[in-house]
Amino acid sequence: MSRHRDVKNLDLDDYELDEEPGEEELTEEQEEEFRSAVATVRETLLGVPISEKEIADTVWYYYFDVEKSVNYLLQKASSKAGAKEKQNTDSQKEKKQNKSKEALADAKDPLDESSNGIKNLSLNKNDEPAFQTNGEVKMKNSSESDNQPEKKKIKKQNPTDLVSVPEIFEQSNPKPVVHLVVTGHVDSGKSTMLGRIMFELGEINSRSMQKLHNEAANSGKGSFSYAWLLDTTEEERARGVTMDVASTTFESDKKIYEIGDAPGHRDFISGMIAGASSADFAVLVVDSSQNNFERGFLENGQTREHAYLLRALGISEIVVSVNKLDLMSWSEDRFQEIKNIVSDFLIKMVGFKTSNVHFVPISAISGTNLIQKDSSDLYKWYKGPTLLSALDQLVPPEKPYRKPLRLSIDDVYRSPRSVTVTGRVEAGNVQVNQVLYDVSSQEDAYVKNVIRNSDPSSTWAVAGDTVTLQLADIEVNQLRPGDILSNYENPVRRVRSFVAEIQTFDIHGPILSGSTLVLHLGRTVTSVSLKIVTVNNKRSRHIASRKRALVRISFLDGLFPLCLAEECPALGRFILRRSGDTVAAGIVKELC
């Protein structure tokens, strides 16, 4: 590889690769290193408006250095966004000068709408993780000693404003709330299954369902009508795949189910990880039709990777929905064949207990064996429960609602005279009139309203609940997905590095000490550097497949909120990926 010109502040738009006849060609190892670096940068900058050519040129120029490439491309995107923001700011400056703080909160802001852009990236190591909204990259400055707030802009919490949520919760004897994540290979029928369940339970009326049937048929996708209840965007419907976690709720006689329909395509694995990170149980959907099961499970499909991820993220019980068995004439032999293969894999390879793996044959499109039994030929040999009955038999884990509050944010948007966030209470409890603290922005906020598990009449929520909070005294651009809200007195820590225990999967090539990887923790996706401490309790410079290692992981993009796995499992478990492949799962052991 030829040496590049030593030019400061080089603009890669003006840079062209030398193509002189005598230039040295890349070796196979260098080509693999180049491809790996490009893939890592692309995944890290997911959502930033940067072309594939810009990424490749930058990686080439920086000799495959991922960190330098990411920083350069972020700087370039930030410059473009900064120019646009300055123009917007200047045009409104005079109007905003004499407005009160309350009027400012209601003013139209160029950052009002949330987007699916990248989160938690920054330009250099002394900056707070960057985030993107409406295509604009914003930066937040930070220091290492800012876990505690320096000042409060609203009054100190008055205990008389609050009630004892744990006591109220225990006395209310509520119906259990269960969080399910539905996973499986693309086109296995996950969204169709959930849509059909919602229709059967009366969550959508016949008139609305008929409208969806007509729309799907007119688009040449008649069999997708139930899936369209969850796949609501134009792109998802056009492509016929779920691209982000679709959330929905339904209720049986025994439980309330909060459902996350995880993407099945490997391009959207980060959405699957986000959906599974807070789930109590999982439903793994497999397509039993001829060749499709083999393609999704045996031929490097996503079913296997999803199973590994589910167990790594702490899910210990799983229901396997053997879908489309009607296409196999409700064959008992086909069901048993799939059951034997999948159960052997889940128990022997992934680590599920035999008693925690359940199999249910279904047809999502016809609704057979989802809610109730019918006259299908299935019941000539199948005597087990319906899918909903199997789910109702699962015992939800106890919720840590008396611990300090830890509330993970999924989405943020502006609402009239306030800011609205959606997320999940991972530990503790939250209520109206409470003061919350966001360690990432060093800002506090006042809870005006709480919607608990889609119930607008609620005034509080506890660990395990999905919530929508209406917040006052904070701006929409001061919060972002991946942030963790806590009590002002017991804030979550924000760190630059941590010690973790990881378990590698079957990987192509060892993980070397000093490697740059992509860390997934809930909605947070960011680049990290990994240094090996020990491998199987021995010193080593690399980690091979199926090894347990103690490592030190450092964030490359500033400080991040983090919890020990023993204190809050949902916020202390993570996944490591490299070049588009999942390479390891880990738990946080020590904050540095």
UniProtKB/Swiss-Prot annotation:
Gene field: hbs1
Could you tell me which CDD domains the record lists for this protein?
Answer: EF1_alpha, eRF3_II_like
Chain residues that bind GTP:
184-191, 323-326, 352-355
**Subunit and interaction comment:** Component of the Dom34-Hbs1 complex, also named Pelota-HBS1L complex, composed of dom34 and hbs1.
Tell me which GO cellular component terms the UniProt record holds.
Answer: cytosol; Dom34-Hbs1 complex
Recorded superkingdom: Eukaryota
Polar residues bias locations: 113-124
Where are the compositionally biased (Acidic residues) regions?
12-32
Q: What is this protein called?
A: Elongation factor 1 alpha-like protein
User: Catalysed reaction(s)?
Assistant: GTP + H2O = GDP + phosphate + H(+)
A single Gene Ontology MF term assigned here is: translation elongation factor activity
Biological processes annotated in GO: cytoplasmic translational termination; endoplasmic reticulum unfolded protein response; nuclear-transcribed mRNA catabolic process, no-go decay; regulation of translation; translation
Give the compositionally biased regions (Basic and acidic residues): 82-111, 137-151
Kindly state which keywords UniProt assigns to this record, in alphabetical order: Cytoplasm, Elongation factor, GTP-binding, Hydrolase, Nucleotide-binding, Protein biosynthesis, Translation regulation
Query: What lineage is on file?
Result: Eukaryota, Fungi, Dikarya, Ascomycota, Taphrinomycotina
Region described as G5 = 363-365
- Localization: Cytoplasm
Q: What class of enzyme is it?
A: hydrolase
Q: Which segments carry the region annotation G2?
A: 240-244
Question: What region holds the tr-type G domain?
Answer: 175-401
Q: Where is this region: G3?
A: 261-264
Q: Using the UniProt annotation, give all residue ranges assigned to the region (G1).
A: 184-191
Source species of the chain: Schizosaccharomyces pombe (strain 972 / ATCC 24843) (Fission yeast)
Could you tell me the EC number(s) of this protein? 3.6.5.-
The record's family statement is: Belongs to the TRAFAC class translation factor GTPase superfamily. Classic translation factor GTPase family.
Which intervals of the chain are annotated as region Disordered? 1-35, 78-159
Q: Where is this region: G4?
A: 323-326
Described by its record, this protein's role is as follows: GTPase component of the Dom34-Hbs1 complex, a complex that recognizes stalled ribosomes and triggers the No-Go Decay (NGD) pathway. The Dom34-Hbs1 complex recognizes ribosomes stalled at the 3' end of an mRNA and engages stalled ribosomes by destabilizing mRNA in the mRNA channel. Following ribosome-binding, the Pelota-HBS1L complex promotes the disassembly of stalled ribosomes, followed by degradation of damaged mRNAs as part of the NGD pathway.
